[in-house]
Amino acid sequence: MSNCELTVLKPAEVKLSPRDREGIINPMYDCQPAGAQYAGIGIKDCIPLVHGGQGCTMFVRLLFAQHFKENFDVASTSLHEESAVFGGAKRVEEGVLVLARRYPNLRVIPIITTCSTEVIGDDIEGSIRVCNRALEAEFPDRKIYLAPVHTPSFKGSHVTGYAECVKSVFKTITDAHGKGQPSGKLNVFPGWVNPGDVVLLKRYFKEMDVEANIYMDTEDFDSPMLPNKSIETHGRTTVEDIADSANALATLSLARYEGNTTGELLQKTFAVPNALVNTPYGIKNTDDMLRKIAEVTGKEIPESLVRERGIALDALADLAHMFFANKKVAIFGHPDLVLGLAQFCMEVELEPVLLLIGDDQGNKYKKDPRIEELKNTAHFDIEIVHNADLWELEKRINAGLQLDLIMGHSKGRYVAIEANIPMVRVGFPTFDRAGLYRKPSIGYQGAMELGEMIANAMFAHMEYTRNKEWILNTW
């Protein structure tokens, strides 16, 4: 008989739980009005009007300027004590008329509530009816769409605020235009992604010979001042694009929490089929997206994308087993990003042991198939904390959690610096590394970019800490 023993590996555990305290320490997500403003600035000839204090606009615009290195026009009703007591309806009505007079090309105004205006109970829909009558009287030859966006800051996050604004603007405009002739186009809701991701998606659709409208089209967030470019608004999604969404062949929702509700609205109201697929982080998710596009449109996946896939696979294979295998990773940010990056990490042999999701939609996460997929494929334990903050990350590191890499936005950089752990910047906002908003994180090209960013962060850390840096001489 042999003396060898049989080791039985315990099954991996994926634990999903909320933050274990009421107070927030070092928040990792923004409020609902911030997300609503981001959706608004993606629309051409649109200026969001935030019904609240000036800080609800000023600090969000600062975040946009830090991330994109561009200025964005967002208006505020500048709520003060008097309005908090007697109501702020007059501030809304005055703000809408001032915007209409100041911006002759203005066509859309999302009216975004805040915690203060939701608490005092301002009737936004009633104010919009009053504003519409005033606009018709003063500007009979112009049509300005006013969309009510209810985004109290005391619940949800920038993710739910983004989704709410997109849905409200689409409902307002499509209800006004109704159903028209079929366009044969594809509606695409990529969610909260960077301009570089939008450019990549456009290229994919062009190579597949598919006509698509991407909502919201942020490509011009990074573009020169050209003669036909608006100096007030940077978004490329037009009112006509939004109205035409009711006539589309189908909707492709690439973000479960950041646009899928609008796809469901179009399906329910105008019978436009809605196909929900995972945000295309990594190879498999990109494969699934392209297959779905081919299935819906009848187009073939071109050789150019097959070649790009092969290049990405080759680049990632050069890194995965030698440098990434068994490396522990913590990821924080909004849910579609975090779960998508976790799937990508699994593809390249990284181990996403801690996922921090800055949102309070706990019941929805329990039904997310990506979490079930992680349970079925991981050979290591994973902890997922929703409604999280950055203290949840710092606390676990201080308690002894061994990490080789942190992935998240720039607000978490001091945690990585203090713990001497390499960090890759992804998500929003990223302002301490140059030009990240221009680079894609999705698709085959994005997978290759992410893999190389991770590798280079690890390589730099090996050199600065003199930890087996000699390996880089022989690689």
UniProtKB/Swiss-Prot annotation:
Name its co-factor(s): [8Fe-7S] cluster
GO BP of this protein: nitrogen fixation
Instruction: State how the cofactor is bound.
Output: Binds 1 [8Fe-7S] cluster per heterodimer.
Which residues hold [8Fe-7S] cluster? 31, 56, 115, 153
Please name the Gene3D superfamilies in this protein's record: Nitrogenase molybdenum iron protein domain, Nitrogenase Molybdenum-iron Protein, subunit B, domain 4
Question: Looking at the keywords, is ATP-binding present?
Answer: yes
Q: Which SUPFAM superfamilies match?
A: Helical backbone' metal receptor
A single Gene Ontology MF term assigned here is: metal ion binding
Q: Which Pfam families match?
A: Oxidored_nitro
Give the reactions, separated by semicolons, that this protein catalyses.
Answer: N2 + 8 reduced [2Fe-2S]-[ferredoxin] + 16 ATP + 16 H2O = H2 + 8 oxidized [2Fe-2S]-[ferredoxin] + 2 NH4(+) + 16 ADP + 16 phosphate + 6 H(+)
Classification via InterPro entries: ChlB/BchB/BchZ, Nase/OxRdtase_comp1, Nase_comp1_CS, Nase_VnfK
Q: What class of enzyme is it?
A: oxidoreductase
* Keywords attached to this entry: ATP-binding, Iron, Iron-sulfur, Metal-binding, Nitrogen fixation, Nucleotide-binding, Oxidoreductase
**Which Gene Ontology CC terms are recorded?**
vanadium-iron nitrogenase complex
Q: What EC number(s) does the entry state?
A: 1.18.6.1
Q: Which NCBIfam families match?
A: vnfK_nitrog
Q: Which family does it belong to?
A: Belongs to the NifD/NifK/NifE/NifN family.
Query: What role does this protein play?
Result: This vanadium-iron protein is part of the nitrogenase complex that catalyzes the key enzymatic reactions in nitrogen fixation.
Question: What is said about its interaction partners and assembly?
Answer: Hexamer of two alpha, two beta, and two delta chains.
Q: What is the name of the protein in this document?
A: Nitrogenase vanadium-iron protein beta chain
Q: What is the lineage of its organism?
A: Bacteria, Pseudomonadati, Pseudomonadota, Gammaproteobacteria, Pseudomonadales
